[in-house]
Amino acid sequence: MRSSGVLMHISSLPSPYGIGTMGKEARKFVDFLDKSGQKYWQILPICPTSYGDSPYQSFSSFAGNPYFIDLEILCKEKLLKKAECESFPWGSNPHYVDYGVMYNSRYALLKKVYARFMKKQPEDFASFCEKEAEWLEDYALFMALKDAHGGIAWFEWEKELKTREQKALSEAKETYADDILFYKMLQYLFFKQWWALKEYVNEKGIEIIGDVPIYVAGDSADVWANPAQFYLDENLDPIDVAGCPPDAFSADGQLWGNPLFRWDEMKKDGYSWWTKRIKAMSKLYDIVRIDHFRGFDSYYAIPGTDDTARNGEWREGPGMDLFHALEKKLGKLNIIVEDLVFLTPSVLKLVKDSGFPGMKVVQFAFDSREGSDYLPHNYPTHCVVYTGTHDNDTILGWMNTAPKASVKFAKEYLNLTKEEGYNWGMMRGAWASVGDLAIVPMQDIIGVGSEGRMNTPSTLGGNWEWRATADQIDNKLAKRLYKYMEMYGRVRKDVKEEAKEEAKEEAKEEA
């Protein structure tokens, strides 16, 4: 079934309070998707971000980002006052998140919420904490201890806490009981709002595609609470870390720094950590997109003490053994795989054997590094087509910065014109393709340049900040988008049927 969707992270939604949230603007965006005939809303990971603000480097794989808790909903619940929200600074530019300002203002307000919340705890708060205890207990304690240590990484804590000695943990739970409850409350509020939003999305006939990074951050509750699952030495420092090897465009390669999984240990317990993770993410989202899928076939391991990726080596991953174990425990998995880099025959075989759809990126079709596999006429039907991902420049940004020969080829191949708009022409290439699903970033629909780029890999600062404003997402844009969906057979089925009924009614009235 041909379908389409839009990539728009929650942080990028309009908001008067510095960052997109799960409130009314999220519902307005869902209405926009509905009116334009979309089937899917794709978002980036919604876990709590750490110091670089990247959703791919989180303090927990299971927790939700407190930044996305909607303040107006908290006002309606009498946990905040609007005047309090308006009294804090939220950044000076409505098109970007100011994370420094965001952190200070948001947490000061959430402390006020906590004081009121604890006076009259909701009846289901205790049951929420009990139900989610398997990850929530470690996460809340981890965050409370981070605060107590001035934010330093857990592997720099005193030995008894670093190694999770039972006596030290018991004392910490008593000493920081109030802080632990604060972090549990944040998760309660997050998931209460998330499930309400997801229900609204699904009632419209729309599904959420959520990103799951293959690796977790070293400074996370995941690693602190499960050290045996990762390649750590006796001091709990990473023996090897993740990254990508050097190539013609990066002499040093990419040093990501994430600790690597100890796949041999994971196999012994039936991949229980991965089972818990995929089970949780499959509940959170309707479809899971796994980032860096090739890492399950083989992964690049770099010595933990190195400062470049030059001395790394490829090692064998778990392959289909992991996915057989997951499907045995969880049933059929709804997964999209990111299969865009270092594609060897064995990686391609793993993608094929998994049965999961892979990805095609239209921008790559005109990039000499990637070649013709990404040209739309070469796509299989069983794939997800993107104009670009969160790591790409926007279409208009690419048109202004790519080599002239690449831009010329794109113009000729897709018949790009200024009259239609270069962004609409390239999106048309994705929608017109035979790929079952086509997804385009909201920045390309709005038509912004490089200022709307979400992330530039291997750079620090200026990433994950872009935001839309309410006036950029309107009915006129939805109607234009719908026409393309109609033209290329991608209108969501129920919307198509509603449109037919409306046309019949209009014909009767005219008669």
Language-model features and meaning:
Residues 1-11, 27:
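N-terminal regions that are enriched for targeting/export leaders
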Residues 9, 15, 53-191, 216-439, ...:
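Alpha-amylase-like alpha-glycosidases and glucanotransferases acting on alpha-linked glucans and related
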Residues 24-49, 284-285:
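Catalytic domains of carbohydrate-active enzymes, especially glycoside hydrolases
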Residues 34, 194-202, 327, 351-352:
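Surface-exposed amphipathic alpha-helices with a cationic face
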Residues 44, 207-209, 213, 287, ...:
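Outer-envelope exported proteins of Gram-negative bacteria
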Residues 183, 188-215:
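Conserved, well-ordered alpha-helix/loop/beta-strand core segments that scaffold catalytic motifs
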Residues 447-500, 511:
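Structured C-terminal cap/extension of enzyme domains
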